Amino acid sequence: MNMMRTAMLLAFMTALFMGVGFLIGGKGGMMIALLIAAGMNLFSYWNSDKMVLSAYRAREIDEANAPEFFHMIRDLSQNAGLPMPKVYIYDSPQPNAFATGRNPENAAVAASTGLLERLTPEEVAGVMAHELAHVQNRDTLTMTITATLAGAISMLGNFAFFFGGNRENNNNPLGFIGVLVAMIVAPLAAMLVQMAISRTREYSADRRGAEICGNPLWLASALQKISGMAQQIHNDDAERNPATAHMFIINPLSGERMDNLFSTHPNTENRVAALHAMAQEFSPRASTPPPSGDRPVRKSGSVPTTGWRRGNENERKGPWS
């Protein structure tokens, strides 16, 4: 299903590229756009994860320089039955996180310094388990390719005027009106694609993430905190790269106050409600209290060690059980 969804996404993005090319330069422009789209699809498959990590200036960490956070990811990955992903931290006061990579064998998870400093260990575990769920569900390929191509399509639409705005351009079958259509429709269509693939996968990743970390209430508490802080703390890199907004656990853009229909993410209250309902199904872990909101904020960028008990390997354990 995920491979089919990815193929349909690539086909739509390619068709959109060709359509904009046709509006700008007729059949010749359409063929050039097809070649560009094919090249970008191939490039995105192999390199889009590197581009996203580079855009946020994320730095890879290991057991030596961030042992506690690294160990937590290792334990959560083992609980999910996943290979150990590469682990990154990027500098941003806004608490948030994302996952990227073309498959579980070539995956990476990234957390902001704000996430590690402002959330409790249990909440961090819930967030990173959510990101690992995206890796396990193979959402990361779709997310990274969408971010790359949506940004390129928006750029092509924004520059359509300069490439095809000449009223005397005989290669443009629809003239100046066609260019205006390309400028408006292309970025909008790219945004709609991002919304379409984002909504249901977030609920699925929430549920699987709660299973991985062992307690839905940890993730629910994290979502509430991140959602509130995202409106108050700007993420400058995300503002410069809005096409990547759908990759984060909570939309990082400061202007995200749209309703459910036009949001890149499901409504946070709905996600939290679903997790609380899920907590009632969890046994015996449903009685585990949510993380304390009055715990002092940590000054370092590390997360306390998981303390995962190994006594019974068949029993699912959360990293702070």
From Swiss-Prot:
GO molecular function, one term: zinc ion binding
Signal peptide: none
Membrane-related topology note: Multi-pass membrane protein
PROSITE patterns according to UniProt: ZINC_PROTEASE
Biased composition (Basic and acidic residues): 310-321
Positions bound to Zn(2+): 130, 134, 202
GO BP: any one term: proteolysis
Keyword Manganese part of the UniProt annotation: no
Cellular component GO terms, alphabetical: plasma membrane
InterPro entries noted in UniProt: HtpX_protease, Pept_M48_protease_HtpX, Peptidase_M48
NCBIfam families: PRK01345.1, PRK03001.1
UniProt similarity note: Belongs to the peptidase M48B family.
Protein name: Protease HtpX homolog
Taxonomic classification: Bacteria, Pseudomonadati, Pseudomonadota, Alphaproteobacteria, Hyphomicrobiales
Gene name of the encoded protein: htpX
